[in-house]
């Protein structure tokens, strides 16, 4: 085990604070509409230009181990806020720096760190309740667009396209972000349920122009095993042929004689059929087949529940308004399943999303939920160069998270105003002793910091503007983009409540840990490896080796 370097008391806290300042000073220049960019070196390729706080924080590793510990703890604030709310990382970092700075001054003056922490926690709790009271729901597409615009660093094209996507696929819908091929942002919306499996034979194609199989008002057969024997399928095929409707078969696989017979029947026009493989693998395949069954009103033919293919009837089949099968994907539009069943299935999947601890599983469950509940929208980000594309894509993803948070918990006035208004709830708060009162004052002072930083980044005098905003009431605030005062909500400067709340709670949590730190332990720096001995061979008079 390597030797350790241990620092105590004020010495440890000072080193930790230096690390906090290095990280926070690099991150906070990005805050607000007039925030600056940060350029990040990459080990290969062009450098990355970003205004995203968490991207800057993640890049920072310091040489001094004790400074690095401080930086990593604040980095945790940014990451945690990003994970919970998807945005607000810079605000959280600015709040944490202010709380730690003021807290360590109080500790150096001889106050009890534990009482300071209790006071800060009490103040943040009161401020959080006040934020919830200030919060207003975010129903209008216009408000969603404004939240997206603010989060995307005042790029209104991003805010507008996100609002449009949300309107089309609903709150539960999946919105994904991809690299585009043009200079403009584009929006693609897939209605209905789409999964990534195409036709098993090109002979099923009936629309030569789009190279797809299109089935109007088809029956849908769902089977969880392979189909290789046509005899098993005959009863269903005869029933479908009599009804004069097309048939979509979704099974683990359709092969051999069964596939050949289906192709021949389709070519001759006896019955219009298309076969596709079931989506997913293993348990996920079973779950997705069940989703399709509920969406279309079908029953999954499975030997596990005592159903066999040769005994299947038309009542076991589902229906939909239209099905489109391409080379790589199948889209079922307007399935005829019951609304009540679909809602119940969505609730079940939501419960699984809450329970799962795996990010991958959560993503897949949310995809399934979107396919059942709304649809899928793809935002294709357009840019002139790859560097711009990466930077813009990161901003779109940030804005998307922020708008989801706004829909979830509502909105508060932006530009640091909500936190200034929340100070009112903390003003008359009293702690159990003097040190707790100082803790409350520390949190109160820190809550002014985001507004001060936004104003400083805009090149104005923070104290003057803060005083004027604090004298106002409600949504009155300062628009740093154009230097005007007014109603922040009317000016479209909004923050999701969830983002502001998470930033405040997470920064207080880490600041509390840091001011109550009394010792820090790190590995001793290793001495450089000894130099290689001079060349030469034994008994040869130290003859140099070439």
Swiss-Prot record:
This enzyme's EC code(s): 5.6.1.7
GO cellular component term, pick one: cytoplasm
Task: Provide the catalytic activity annotation.
Answer: ATP + H2O + a folded polypeptide = ADP + phosphate + an unfolded polypeptide
GO MF terms, alphabetically ordered: ATP binding; ATP-dependent protein folding chaperone; isomerase activity; unfolded protein binding
* Signal peptide coordinates: none
What is the recorded function of this protein according to its Swiss-Prot or TrEMBL entry? Together with its co-chaperonin GroES, plays an essential role in assisting protein folding. The GroEL-GroES system forms a nano-cage that allows encapsulation of the non-native substrate proteins and provides a physical environment optimized to promote and accelerate protein folding.
Q: Which HAMAP family match?
A: CH60
Q: What does the similarity note say? A: Belongs to the chaperonin (HSP60) family.
This chain's protein is named Chaperonin GroEL
